């Protein structure tokens, strides 16, 4: 998994608002995985606007033309306790950092407090390069440290790329199909130190 010094890892896990790591995509592109910030609003909005309709449908299970201001605020305004959100960013030639992926979990404080719902979104030109895989790995470490035992996600049955991310995660997985939705549960109990 991640190769962090024990001291640095404890500090990052104690306060995920400061989470930061450097990674490399499958194609060699350097990326930063870090906690979402309020100033990511425009970059996230631009990434969403560039998505094709099918990508939006696979993520939200409904057509959606754009994000409203309240929806954008909800995306960037996280508490890093019940809701943890990380972004993957790259630096453009001019030095501007742009968001190319978003991964988040929302803990279920009521019904199953040890579980969290998981979701990802990857910018169009960066799909298939391992961004969701990296975000999942980092989110799993944070969630495990926070005492969560499992992630849950509902995935459209034809969304093979997302299902493959879960299958290749190295985490114990169970699946249950209901119509065209596959309910995935990933156990965080093993393989995470």
Functional labels for PLM-detected ranges:
Residues 1-193:
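Long, contiguous binding/interaction regions
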């Amino acid at each position: 998994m991640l190769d962090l010094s024990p001291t640095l890892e404890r500090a990052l896990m104690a306060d995920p608002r400061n989470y930061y790591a450097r990674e490399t995509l499958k194609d060699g592109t350097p990326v930063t995985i870090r906690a979402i910030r309020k100033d990511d609003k425009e970059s996230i909005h631009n990434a969403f606007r560039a998505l094709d309709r099918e990508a939006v449908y696979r993520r939200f299970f409904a057509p959606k033309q754009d994000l409203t201001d309240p929806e954008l605020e909800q995306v960037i305004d996280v508490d890093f306790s019940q809701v943890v959100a990380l972004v993957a960013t790259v630096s453009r030639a001019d030095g501007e950092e742009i968001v190319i992926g978003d991964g988040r979990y929302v803990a279920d404080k009521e019904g199953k407090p040890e579980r969290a719902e998981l979701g990802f979104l990857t910018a169009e030109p960066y799909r298939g390069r391992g961004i969701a895989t990296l975000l999942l790995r980092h989110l799993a470490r944070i969630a495990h440290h926070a005492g969560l035992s499992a992630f849950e996600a509902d995935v459209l049955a034809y969304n093979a790329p997302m299902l493959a991310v879960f299958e290749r995660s190295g985490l114990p997985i169970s699946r249950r199909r209901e119509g065209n939705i596959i309910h995935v549960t990933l156990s965080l109990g093993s393989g995470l130190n």
